[in-house]
């Protein structure tokens, strides 16, 4: 097992026309995330029981239909937010990939969480993303683009903070062959990294609240 999380940076309320937004980076990988809502939804898409989610990931270039990541973020938000509090409404979350030097999926998930925190959404639990790759039987956390390209397997964990404060798997997407022992090892590596990301959330939000109170 090798590596550690690259340096994280975040600027909240980055986009002035959004209800919540963030410019978030890990190393040289950077995204812009924004959210709008809860707001009105077209009658054909409205639910009597819960808020609907509109999730969109857009790469800086190439195909913008990043369906796997959209599904992971959608599944994660369904667990992290009590959607039943806002029936007949919708919330839109958009993530733009600005620069990709690896771990884009994890960075996109983290940026989406920051945008929702900036919006003041009531969470059941916060969430984050952690990417692990396998290179020559070695597991590497938060890989660069070069390390991803050399990998024989990738697993993206969407992690929620459990009621006991410990990380729990919320969603997962794996590429390549992974046996149970390898997945268990990857999850063991991801857990302390998820805790470090949650601590970073707390630091950033404390800074935001202290500024807002001035």
Curated annotation (Swiss-Prot):
Keywords assigned: Apoptosis, Cytoplasm, DNA-binding, Exosome, Nucleus, rRNA processing
PROSITE patterns recorded: PROKAR_LIPOPROTEIN
Keyword ATP-binding: no
Gene Ontology MF, one: enzyme binding
Keyword Methyltransferase: no
GO BP term, example: nuclear mRNA surveillance
Family: Belongs to the RNase PH family.
Quaternary structure, from the entry: Homodimer. Component of the RNA exosome complex. Interacts with crn-4; interaction promotes the DNase activity of crn-4. Interacts with crn-3, cps-6 and cyn-13.
UniProt protein name: Exosome complex component RRP46 homolog
